[in-house]
């Protein structure tokens, strides 16, 4: 039973996994992934944030439908999961019931919460269903038949039904067929009845499960919706409470402000009563006392107002804090909603866990099948009712969400109101400061009056006492105010700042009193001076009275204008928002300008790097024909111009700041004018006259606004022209880039040809070495002389063919150089044309500058008039200043770019001259080579004479002259040796015949081994010759291809030249216009002294530029400067446009304020009720109009955004179309026509502007007359006001009470009036803005396209310029390499002469033996260091003659000395030893030559040949030190091939040869590693520089850096390994020399040598891999330089990789060849020594 119980623990896990596990159910997996994605989208939408609450509300309303959609989809997915879960649980319950009936003896498995313990009897965890064994594992048919469990047949039928019910066909087919087949086999007693019952049970269970799943899902949905409803209701209630709290707080704050205002009015009344009492006491002293009282009154009023303003500011701060707290609460609510969602996800996971727990309870499923029909029907009804409820709840939820949104709207409105209140407080504080300034001015006048009073000296003391009493009274009142302040401080701690301000005012008052006392003392001392001032006293008293009147009117206006200030502040806030939007657009433009400036900065850095090389090229500049002194002076002059222009720019910035301060003063004056108009409006008689004047002013302002719009349009046209000019310059730069690319390709081709020439030269050297080895072998092997001669002749023919090919390549190189020179001539012609163009453009720019200066003077005059009259014409002056800055920036940048361009040109010229100088050096070296050839001819004649003396017939063959010389020398040596051998044979025939036979046998063995080695080497040589022939054919094909490409490039260059000519003709028209503007600018400069100096400097610069026509100024510099200037001008003009718009808005605001003041005064006196009705109607109409205007503005802004996106897309597309120059030509033509049209339009607009300015002047004169009339009327009214002061005081008291009553009404009307005023002001501004925006859109569309194209042209030009510079550098490097190659050839010729000299010395030793016996051999000096090589060759010729004489003497002596055979034999043995020593020295020199040949392969890696020579010298010295003292003959060394046939005495040469080979390999590896180290350092520098320039590709450069560091580490490891191997080889071979006797030690040494050679071979392979890796990194760097340079850089990278791979591929072959060559040590460059007998 335990087995059955264990099987029950997870009996239906297979079915449960198919319904629940996401791995087995694709539907579940997709549903879960969909839910996850929806949740992430919802979180993303909720997490979005904004700067302000209003923005957040807008975002919420925009994202609300998206959120609703996501929530609905999430709910649907969750509902589907719930239905699936309910279906599964229902099936499980039915299965549990049927199993309980089938197996009553078993313990029933509890389902859901029915299990008290929650675990099965077998100890398995119910929460881990996957860990149980399969359900049907223990159920087998044999067990069932045996009745092991005691189950009856009825029970078995029920079991069979249960199993049939549980066996889904899908599960059977899913991999459990074996066990299910067993179960069916054991339980299939009644198949037919079981199947029918199972089908019914399945259908009924499915219906019931579906219905129950729907019920459960709907219940869950209802519970969730209700929970959400409750949460939303709670949030709604909270928000309502917060709103009510805010409203109550606002009302409290308003009440507090009212109470404070009432207290302030009471305090003012008390101050006025005090003033009246003081006036009664001081009737006798009316003038001075009245003035002082008024000052005190003004101070008190201002203090009260300051306190009120500070209180209001504190209240506003409190409101702002509360609003911020509300926003935080809302954020917290959002966070809580997110946590609720997370909790829902957690609950879902818990549901999944409970689903896994319910797997164990699958035994009660059959009983529920009977009741499924009834439940299904009931469930369907419940489902329908629940669906209706759910829909209702969803609707209620939506309604609550709408209410929540309304609450958010109200909160946003309250925040806006708080913001407006803050602005009002700031405005009031500013007005109070203005009042304080006026009071100070009045106090100064009072001081002057007190000085003028002579008779009041004695009375001043009494007045001071009275003033003290008054100050005591004021201090008492101030104490009362202090008490009030303490009350306010208890309410809000922020009013402390107001108290400190009040105390500072008191201190100022006390200071003024002290100053009065000091002034009184001064009056006593200066009484005589004041007598003369009595006449002026009366006038000053009148002025003081006027100031009193003004102060009173200002006090009244401060109270009455509070409401108007609030409305104006609201307008100002809206205008500020519009200004912020415009500033954002301006920032975008500024970013574009900064991007262009960064690109220009990059170009400047590159040009500065080129300029660093200028110092080294000054001497070469003199060779070219340029004068460096004049060039430096011109550069200095341009720098001085640049500095002066910078100073001008700084001055203009200072002027701009001054103008901004003037603008602020203008705003203050405008406010003062408004206050004055309000004071004048109190007089009913003067109101009508002022209304007429206001109408005229409104008309004038409208005309001014129209004029400004016209000026804006004119500026836009100017901007379009400037942009077209930038595009022209960019097109020219692109064409120059094409030319530079062509030059660069030509240089690359030349480099390839040079590299091929080097390879061919190396191959020639190798062939020469092969020839020498073959001749030496011919001497040793007399039997193979004929065959070897034939092969040598073939090799000589091939060598001649190679020379012919080399000459052909040289002619091709000369033709390519001629083509390059032709291109340089064409560029010079272009530069000449450009010089004329520069002069023309400068004259035109002078005209533009003169016109601009003229306009500046006119605008300055107007500004002065308006400052005196109305101070409203400052915008024109600002525009002129902006234009001056633009021009100055343009001049600075143009001068800097001209200087840079000149530097580049001079560098290019210097490089070309360097090329020519290098060619001349090559020619000189060729002459030296010819002289050396002549010397060799002289030596040949001497050798021929020696042959004739020796009676040797010279060889007449078809080979080369070098081979003939070698043959002749060999014949001479052979003849001499034959003579010696003949003598020895005659002397020793009888005595040593046996010894000679043994020697001959050994010699024959050696000859056999040598013959075998020679045959193998011949085969290898034949294969190498074939490979070289293939390489030559490949190089021919490449040269033909390069010639074809060069022809195509020349055609392209010619086409570019023609295009440039056409563009130059088109550009000349544009520069004429620029010259006209410059003339106008010079006219304006004549007005000012500073501008006169600048004009003189500019004229000097223009004259210098005209003198420098022949110095080839480049087209691109001016065009680049013009484009940069125009881009800056566009940005500055846009700033000017924005400032103009702001000025127009300010004018409209001024007019609106005047109209508002009129309407308010009329409404307060006459028609309050009628105004409310009309305000409602007008408000509705204006709302409609404003909605339309807002819609239009939104559409315009969206259009602008769309245009910006289109501009970005166009940029991306245009970058791919840089090389389409034909399209650019057509665009240039269109731009030319547009520029001409724009110039005409500008001229017409300029005339219109002049007419408008004349009308404006007339209007100014009219206003001046009106103003004079007003002044007169004001003087009369002021006299009347003096009489009516007492009456006005009483009336003011009554008016204050009336105003208190009216304020309640005004507060209700404020909101509506503010809205009406806002609509009126905004409608007027918006309609104007719409018209302007329509014009701007049309202009900006064209301008943006033109700017994009211009920017691309500039970039392409800059890249082409860089390429040209790089090409010239490469060209110079190639010529330097060629020069070095010629130097190497000369060194080799010198070495050949040196070897000839040594061979002659050996001849002398053979010929004149007695001289060598008498004294040691003197060492000969090398010809490498001797400058006069011809004399050395003559000396050699004389020595050859001496050898002839010596030989003749020797023959005569031999005939006489036949008797002394043994003695001569010993002498000959000593001579042989000397020959061996000489031979060893010669082999060392030959290895040195071979190492030099080997090093020449490394030239492609960037190491100079001088350094390589130094390295090889060091290696040669080491090799000399390491060689054993005893030399080896060639025959001994050639025996290394077959070790078995070599005797013990030839082991030492084999070891030395192995050692030499290993050392040569290690030395070559070391050289390669040093070259790779230099390449890695260059890559590091290049990566760092390019990473600084390109900031968008840091990741790619970091990866490359990492790879470079890895390569560097590998290099260091290989270097250390190489050093260790070198030390091992040296130490190991030295040890081997001492252990020759024992064979065991020899075997160990040979194994160790093999290991060392194997390690060396592996090291060379690793070095090869490292070379490929570094080449790959170089290719990556070339690839990262940009998409624009893909073609050119692809060619560069291909050429570089070809060269480097070729060197790498053939390096091994050449190294092996050199090793084989080094085996055969040549006696000299052309002679092989004889083998030792």
UniProtKB/Swiss-Prot annotation:
Top-rank taxon, per record: Eukaryota
| Keyword Transcription regulation attached | no
Record has Nucleus as a keyword: no
According to the UniProt record, one GO cellular component term is: membrane
Region listing for Disordered, in residue ranges = 1456-1476, 1628-1656
An example of a GO molecular function for this protein is: actin binding
* Protein name as annotated: Protein NETWORKED 1D
The record places domain NAB at 12-92
From the broadest rank down, the organism's phylogenetic lineage runs:
Eukaryota, Viridiplantae, Streptophyta, Embryophyta, Tracheophyta
Q: Which UniProt keywords apply?
A: Coiled coil
Q: Which family does it belong to?
A: Belongs to the NET family.
Segments of skewed composition (Basic residues): 1460-1470
Q: Which InterPro entries did the record assign?
A: NAB, NET_actin-binding_domain
Q: Name the PANTHER family for this protein.
A: PROTEIN NETWORKED 1D, PROTEIN NETWORKED 4A
Q: Which residues form a coiled coil?
A: 195-816, 897-931, 960-1043, 1196-1386, 1553-1627, 1653-1686
Family matches, as Pfam families: KIP1
> What is its biological role?
Plant-specific actin binding protein. May be part of a membrane-cytoskeletal adapter complex.
Organism name: Arabidopsis thaliana
